[in-house]
Amino acid sequence: DTPVRTAKNFKINNIEVELDLPEKIAEFKNIEIINDRSTIDNEVSNLPLTYGNGKILEELNYETANSKIRIQTSNKKENIKIRYNFDDNNLKLINQIEIIANGDTNVIIEYKSQTAQKCLHNGIIRAIANENAKLNVTIVNLLNENSDNFEAIENRLEKNSKVNYTIIDIGGKTSVSNYYSNIIGENAENDLKSIYLGISEQRKYINYIAELRVTKTNIDIDV
């Protein structure tokens, strides 16, 4: 049996949740990656998050991650799609995705249930938009209504970069996202659009934080 430590009634963004947090997790094997020409490996940085979803989930991620993907793009236009398919043999995903964007990059990340069993997703997405880069990221949560979904998103924007996020959050019993952008380059722009659909006892929460450290920068948030 897989040993677990149980955290009962701890709070994330003032949402009270009860989770069985696994100490060891088998590799998540049901992943589809469609990639034009980007360099993809698993050498993520593992740097501490500025905000994230709290110490418990962050430590769980760094200690037990069962999927790590680092994407490094060229100066050309590139399209990448990553789909995580939850099934009866892949119920828990503790993942990190790191995107280092240099050109014009589109990334679609999808979490989808192919089972009625309860699934757990605890993810970190970290994006670095280098000078003059354009990065579009779309995140789609299609987990079943028994599942828990937690995503921590952190971005760094360099000079003249533009980062656009679209978050489509439909699935999960509890779904929590923390979004943070560190805008350090002049003329950098960040745009965030989110779509949330919840029924019955579904709980949705997203927290947005942006730090604009130089002049001529902008962030637009549309929820």
PLM-predicted stretches and their roles:
Residues D1-K68:
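Long, low-complexity, mixed-charge
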Residues Y51-V223:
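Conserved beta-strand/loop scaffold segments within soluble protein domains that form the structured core
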